[in-house]
Structures are given as structure tokens and as C-alpha cells.
């Protein structure tokens, strides 16, 4: 059943369609679910969304998700402070953590280079990563960008920026299918990819 393009329900559908991976039909199903749900359940969902927007930010050091100035990984003194694993999105850090394959620091780019879409080095704040390595103490930077054209371009660009600084620059191994986002890979594949990384 099509939702009338006017009114409150249509407004909710239009907002849900803006979410990644949500098409018109899924948005309509979700909107009707919210409508049929108990008022308290719907309000809990709305409050959870508001709390995320009000209570979370990006870590000032690595740009991962944080409830304060620094994320849980940057605050953990037990993590290997000599290695940085570079990912495109915060969700990838949690996928890697579930795999249990890595105990170092992270750097989240919040995207990948895409000149056709107008996304350049300043948009992914590549200079912040370079500055972290320049501060010293970093022995290895592991690039875990997705095996897409944009991810490869980002890895090549970062390698060219980081190699002259003296830290080892490696790339995770390909156990991850080309064209797939890393965050959707299973834990074993991520574990093998990190263990089989190669120098660049």
C-alpha cells in the first residue's frame, strides 16, 4: 500500500528513506511499525536517537565514536601505542574488535578519496594521520581501507604521505572480496586479513 505523499506518516517515510540501505518499501514498513508500536516503545526509539546525537561525538585524536573527548581505544593504556590501524568508518573498528585480531590504536578517516564525488585529502583529514605519525612513537601504520577503487586510491595516497616519515606502512591482506565494505566481513576473514597484511 502506497503512503500518501502528504501528512505525518509520509514525512516519517521520507526521513527513513534518507538512511543508508533503506528504500521506499522498507521505510514504509518501518513507519507503519512505529505507528502500530506502543507509544512508550516509539518514544524510547526517538529518545535513543536523540541521545546518540546529543551524547556522542568524534574522538579528537582518532575520529572514532566517543562519549567524551577521547574514545575508549585512545583511553586504553593497555593498547599497543606503536601501531595505528586506519579505517574508513567507525563501524569498521568495532568489526575488527569483535575479531580480536588487533590491540593497537585506530585512525578513522570518515570516508575515502573520491575525486569524482569531490572528496579530497582534506575531507578525510589525511593530514591529521600524518601529524600523529610525525609526533613519533608510531612504528607501523596498517591501512585497512575497503578494496574498492576509492579505498585503493586512499591507501595509495596515504602510503605516499606516510612512507617518508619512517614508519612501516602495511595493507591488510585480501581475504575480503573486492568491492565489499570491510564492516560487513566476518570476524575470521578480518582476523586473517590483519594477520596476512603486507608492507607497501
Question: What is each model feature region?
Answer:
Residues 3, 15, 198:
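Post-transcriptional modification and biogenesis factors for structured RNAs
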Residues 27, 75-145:
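Extended interfacial segments that mediate partner engagement and assembly in macromolecular machines
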Residues 11, 103, 130-200:
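Long C-terminal interaction/binding lobes of large macromolecular proteins
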Residues 4, 37, 41, 117-121, ...:
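Catalytic cores of large soluble enzymes that bind and process phosphate-bearing ligands
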Amino acid at each position: 500500500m502506497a503512503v500518501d505523499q502528504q501528512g505525518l506518516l509520509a514525512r516519517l517515510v521520507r526521513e527513513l528513506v534518507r538512511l543508508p540501505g533503506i528504500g521506499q518499501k522498507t521505510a514504509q514498513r518501518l513507519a507503519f511499525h512505529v505507528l502500530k508500536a506502543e507509544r512508550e516503545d516509539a518514544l524510547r526509539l526517538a529518545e535513543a536517537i536523540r541521545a546518540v546525537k546529543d551524547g556522542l561525538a568524534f574522538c579528537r585524536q582518532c575520529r572514532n565514536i566517543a562519549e567524551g573527548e577521547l574514545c575508549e581505544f585512545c583511553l586504553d593504556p593497555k593498547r599497543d601505542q606503536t601501531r595505528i590501524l586506519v579505517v574508513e568508518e567507525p563501524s569498521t573498528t568495532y568489526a575488527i574488535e569483535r575479531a580480536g585480531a588487533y590491540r593497537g590504536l585506530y585512525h578513522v578517516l570518515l570516508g575515502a578519496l573520491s575525486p569524482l564525488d569531490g572528496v579530497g585529502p582534506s575531507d578525510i583529514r589525511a593530514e591529521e594521520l600524518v601529524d600523529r605519525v610525525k609526533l613519533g612513537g608510531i612504528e607501523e601504520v596498517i591501512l585497512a581501507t575497503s578494496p574498492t577503487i576509492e579505498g585503493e586510491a586512499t591507501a595509495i595516497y596515504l602510503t605516499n604521505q606516510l612512507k617518508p616519515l619512517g614508519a612501516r606502512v602495511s595493507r591488510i591482506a585480501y581475504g575480503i572480496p573486492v568491492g565489499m565494505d570491510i564492516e560487513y566481513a566476518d570476524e575470521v576473514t578480518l582476523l586473517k586479513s590483519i594477520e596476512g597484511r603486507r608492507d607497501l
